[in-house]
Amino acid sequence: MPIANATTVHSDIDHGTKALYSKITWRLIPFLCFCYLAAYLDRINVGFAKLQMLEDLQFSTAAYGLGAGLFFVGYIIFEVPSNLILQRVGAKLWIARIMITWGLLSACTMFVTSTTQFYILRFLLGAAEAGFLPGVLYYLTMWYPTYRRGRIIALFMIGLPLSSVIGGPISGWIMGHFDQVQGLHGWQWLFLLEAIPSVLLGILTFWALPNHFQQAKWLSADDKAQLAADLAADDAEGKDSKHSFRDGFFNLKVWMLGGIDFSILLSAYAMGFWMPTFIRDAGVSDTFHIGLLTAIPSLAALAGMLMIGASSDRHRERRWHIIVPFIIGAIAMASSTLFSQNLVMTVVLFAIASAAIIGAVPVFFSLPATFLKGTAAATGFALACSVANIAGLVSNSLMGVVTDLTGTSHAALWVFAGCLILSCFLVIALPAKLVNR
């Protein structure tokens, strides 16, 4: 009888804990996912705008690549300061500020008439968005213990592929149907209309996000006590974690993570910004059809995120859930250069590459919080993202220059595939106690 009673109590506790985290997830993750969707859409819609604006404004492909890349200069410079401010003023205020300003600046791109204006606005857009992704990742560490974060980060980050699944067809439709409406080009309407959700979501942030679980009115006192106990136990398991700004900034493991993420983003941004061009080069001219086809690799990335993140949490293993997808993605991306005129093979290979490379991203982003806490976590998340986002400048600039020199945008993909393979050695070098929690 005592054994039966103990089993019943244990079952009740497990059920209560599951219900608690389910409640938190339904309250936070859908909203944050839509925010990330809006952010990434405003970041990469310039890839669709390129199909019209280069001819309208007489920009070269290299000028477009530089402008697309300058976003990341502003992003890199302001990433760490932005995340430290978020830690000081709270997620609610700072995420709202980020979203409203990036939405307004993205809309202003519709008024661009010169390369200088394009460069300035892309830089300012990067500065405005800086801190959003690492800020949300840091925010989630205040709600979920380490062993739950792989799946949760995957659920949050499905906003990334969803931005292309939803945004691709919508972007193509806007450019095709709004061209010359009220005397504006389709690409101008694109920047205006797709900025509106960011501003509206930024305003809603004031009501949707508590700064801390202790401020969540929808959690009971027992819920808060359970959550505090879970997070305290998680902190005890990572008792060697670092806490200060210095610990985050001068930690070799943070810089290693930045190098790994750099390799991820070289490929992710090449696919995100240039996928419409790859599909057009394979023989598709209609912008709406291009938008529909760009959704296929993004759907594959969404499935990859959910499956790889869930598997990693279930096995409490991170290293091989990163390495194996990297190898598969590198092979698929390099192979795509051999079929650049074949539409079916182009879409299939980029779908495989997207599912593997982007699918591993949530697992990767669960690593910093295994050895960083507090200010060090805020600094470490932002620093790793800052180092990595140099890839945005390198990727877009290299793609633009290579296209102007060779007439094709595919040659640079070999470089990006090689970087993914090299980053596998950095993953192997990370201590097992960090990658298997």
From Swiss-Prot:
Chief location: membrane
Listed transmembrane segments: 28-48, 66-86, 93-113, 123-143, 152-172, 189-209, 254-274, 290-310, 320-340, 347-367, 374-394, 411-431
An MF annotation (GO) of this entry: transmembrane transporter activity
Similarity comment text for this entry: Belongs to the major facilitator superfamily.
Protein name: Putative metabolite transport protein NicT
Membrane topology value: Multi-pass membrane protein
InterPro entries, per database record: MFS (IPR011701), MFS_dom (IPR020846), MFS_trans_sf (IPR036259)
PROSITE patterns noted in UniProt: MFS
Signals that turn on the gene: Repressed by NicR in the absence of 6-hydroxynicotinate (6HNA) inducer. In presence of 6HNA, repression is alleviated.
A GO CC term assigned to this protein in UniProt: plasma membrane
The keyword Calcium is assigned to this record: no
GO biological process: catabolic process
Signal sequence interval, chain numbering: none
Cellular compartment(s): Membrane
Keyword field: Aromatic hydrocarbons catabolism, Membrane, Transmembrane, Transmembrane helix, Transport
Record's function text: Probable transporter, possibly involved in the aerobic nicotinate degradation pathway.
A Pfam family per the record: MFS_1
